[in-house]
């Protein structure tokens, strides 16, 4: 159990740092009211989790590595709370078009990315 806690914590440490760097970098190039940085990490994380579980189903993966990547790294790299807060701000500002677009893009692109990732090792 201690090993699992340590690998999840280490994965979270790496994921949180990469999330911050990725969001800042993407938003620097796409400075719009929709946070494309958040969209980027959520889509990429969805793709990676699709890859991970497809690979694990077909080829096997150690429980520690699976915990490191899924719960640790991806748990910290992707962010639903930030997505929710950004949508709240869009609603409060009356920017309903960007509010709807942000939700649609995040939900459908993340689902599509997870499906694509899963197909790779199927």
Curated annotation (Swiss-Prot):
Disulfide bonds: none annotated. GO terms for molecular function: fluoride channel activity; metal ion binding. Pfam families: CRCB. It catalyses: fluoride(in) = fluoride(out). Na(+) is not transported, but it plays an essential structural role and its presence is essential for fluoride channel function. GO terms for cellular component: plasma membrane. InterPro entries: FluC. Fluoride-specific ion channel. Important for reducing fluoride concentration in the cell, thus reducing its toxicity. NCBIfam families: crcB. Belongs to the fluoride channel Fluc/FEX (TC 1.A.43) family. PANTHER family: FLUORIDE EXPORT PROTEIN 1-RELATED. This is Fluoride-specific ion channel FluC. The lineage of its organism: Bacteria, Pseudomonadati, Campylobacterota, Epsilonproteobacteria, Campylobacterales. The gene is fluC.
């Amino acid at each position: 159990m201690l090993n699992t806690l340590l690998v999840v914590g280490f994965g979270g440490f790496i994921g949180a740092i990469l999330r911050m760097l990725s969001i800042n970098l993407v938003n620097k190039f796409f400075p719009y009211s929709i946070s494309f940085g958040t969209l980027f990490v959520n889509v990429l994380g969805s793709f990676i989790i699709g890859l991970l579980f497809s690979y694990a189903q077909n080829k096997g993966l150690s429980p520690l590595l699976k915990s490191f990547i899924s719960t640790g790294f991806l748990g910290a790299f992707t962010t639903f709370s930030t997505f929710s807060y950004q949508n709240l701000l869009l609603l409060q500002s009356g920017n309903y078009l960007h509010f709807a677009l942000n939700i649609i893009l995040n939900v459908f692109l993340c689902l599509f990315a997870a499906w694509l990732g899963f197909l790779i090792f199927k």
